[in-house]
Amino acid sequence: VNEAGTFHLICRDCDSKVFQDYENPDNYKDIPSIKMLAQIDMKNNLKNISKRLMEKEMYDIMRERIGVREEWSQAKKDVNDLDLNEFKEAYARAKKRSLKPFSGDYYIGYYAKLPYVVPVAFQGTIALIFDLEGNVINNVYNQDPKYKIMNMSLCIFPLKTTSIIMMFVSKDNNRYGRFFKQLKKLGNLNEQLSVINYILFSY
């Protein structure tokens, strides 16, 4: 929507077919459907997969061209492989939900429709470290291989005369519950948008 999730490695024909529901501005007259959320989730994970693949190639180039130690390069690639597997699994789940959406597949933790067009468009995943009260959401120092970093999806969609601001998570992600409650308890819309703006430019 307005270039928010433009992913130039996907062919235009595929993009228009696979993601046609969520990329149609007319579908934002109401709260987005589960199918639309699944399509957003799919594209977010495709972007994450592409980023990790490019980073792996970059580490090889750094080793070959500027003499970065092989141990360091391999360690970075090993971490990337873990992320890649998680993003691929998340993409597969999102694709399944897009084809057969069920109520409750996703939870919209925050939604606002603004009566004006915001000057920025964004679509992607963010892994918050703390909530608004300093409680840990994602422990980035946890060394347990079974521990997973959990993302939320943030969408800022400027439309023709309005804007959609939305954050949502998969049904199996319960780490953001307190954060969403804290955000909605803030005094007014401007405070909520200020927090979202801070998150956008901090992560």
State where each predicted segment sits:
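Alpha-helical structural context detector biased toward long hydrophobic helices
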Residues: 1-203
